[in-house]
């Protein structure tokens, strides 16, 4: 039986304005524009802040990549694009209702990101930033392995994963990652091992595996850093929206869908209108239903074969461990 380990909250490091915030995101052809809207909100809420953006691109459209490059340059920040399409070729696109194989891209970070980079902040594309990220980044230096916010719907997932009743379940849409510890302990290999051993338990991609394999080692963060406002998260007082720094539109009901009326709809639309993707059309429910049907046919998880790029990454991760 696993035991719940108490993970102390790290003390913030001194504010160093010369230290850029290293930010990681991943997008495919469907989500490239939404990654751009997310980053535009980050820059708007953090004027004068320097960012070093690492974008994991899985078949992103050339137009979105050009807009992203121009957006980052105007913000006085730096963009590095890592093409991961070939590395994800062993994965099916049909993971779930609103997830694609790109959800697994962050498992490649130990191999893709510079070895000299000690830590990074990962943000999902379905997030809007409304405040300063420097206070969150200050926590990263003392983070033992991962920092994350508990999932507001986590109780419904724990039984499926076999987690103890006292165990937390974290949302992986915002992660503070200690890259040195991630590499040293071959975390990606641990996650992939669990997915290969438990394909029938996977519903939320690597978020499930992160919780199943690492829940005793994740540092809980305040939900102001990942306020989940999906339609399945329940109602929230308006004051909570005002206090949050990162709004996360969880579940399949995204704010870019036609006639979306969920919590935070106007906030998303306002940031979209102020971004280079202001004319990006909404998606429609019929397309969503077709994709959902195809996902059920394809399957949620295809274990990596010994020759697949992900299996290779797993071997590399184990080889680089202690």
Language-model features and meaning:
Residues 1-30, 37, 48, 179-322:
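A glycosyltransferase accessory/donor-loop signature
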Residues 52-59, 147-149:
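Short internal beta-strands
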Residues 64-112:
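Active-site-proximal specificity loops/subdomain of glycosyltransferases
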Residues 66-69, 115, 130-141, 188:
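Short alpha-helix within the catalytic core of nucleotide-sugar-dependent glycosyltransferases
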Residues 120:
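Short aromatic/hydrophobic "clamp" motif used to bind/position activated sugar donors
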Residues 123:
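Catalytic metal- and UDP-sugar-binding loop of GT-A-like glycosyltransferases, i.e.
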